[in-house]
Amino acid sequence: MSRKLCTLNFTLSGKQGSLVIRDIQLWSNRPTASKSTSEXRGQFIQYVDLAKLPLWVRSTNMNTYRCYSTSATAQAYFKSKLRNANRGIVIELXDKVDQRSQEPAYLIIFRENTELNCFQVDLTMKHEFDGQVTKLKQDIGKTRASVSKEGSIDIIIQQXQQRKIGTKTKVYRNVHINDKRLQFNETLSKLILGGLRLRGISNSITDYQKLYKITFDAAEFTHRDELKRISMGSGEEVSFESLQETVETLLKLFTKS
């Protein structure tokens, strides 16, 4: 046996102001605990295509209510707006909320053949989806944070290794440069000492140290370009023959007298 549940009035807002669609009676074929008939108020939200509604909007065990109205305005409105069988009218109920989310409750009024029906939007599955999406975002956030942290550690380790390699390379380079310069000094010193001995100049002579030093300094100046390239790591060792020729020339010049 059908029983009247409530009478719905909802407001339309437009350029001409607000129009109230009155006396929409909702009837149910299922038994209900309450025997009183309530007055419900609502606000028009939008028109929807029923074929494109998400699956969670309407559950399989949801109540569908029959709608009647004695208002000529309401009858004309529904006849005009629900010509398309796939069209629905979304109404936000002003004095009823969804028990789970405490958000406003919604009705969708539609036409099925010649009858006017409506159902309340089921938000249960939507809340489950929202909860899963929120959890998924949190999990993704944690994963990204972990990946970012691990990535940062990897970068730090890599940078440390590169610094170590760079330091070692620099040390090896400096050692190599020092070896070349040391080899130059040793060779130059031996050539000068040998040249002085060949000329019969012993270290007992007063100007021996002075002659050694000016020859050494002059040889360094002669090969200053090669030594500069060596200090920059791009030069080759000064050949023995070239250095020997320089020392001989300088000693001839300094020992003429």
From Swiss-Prot:
Pfam families per record: Sld7_C (PF18596), Sld7_N (PF18636)
Residue spans crossing the bilayer: none
DNA-binding among keywords: no
GO cellular component, one term: nucleus
Keyword S-adenosyl-L-methionine (UniProt): no
Domain of life according to the entry: Eukaryota
GO biological process: DNA replication; regulation of DNA-templated DNA replication initiation
Alphabetic keyword roster: Cell cycle, Cytoplasm, Cytoskeleton, DNA replication, Nucleus
Main location group: nucleus
Location within or outside the cell: Nucleus; Cytoplasm, Cytoskeleton, Spindle pole
Family affiliation: Belongs to the SLD7 family.
Subunit structure of this chain's protein: Interacts with SLD3.
Functional summary from the UniProt entry: Required for the proper function of SLD3 at the initiation of DNA replication. Binds to SLD3 and reduces its affinity for CDC45, a component of the replication fork. Required for mitochondrial morphology.
Protein name: Mitochondrial morphogenesis protein SLD7
Species in which this protein is naturally found: Saccharomyces cerevisiae (strain FostersO) (Baker's yeast)
Gene, per the UniProt record: SLD7
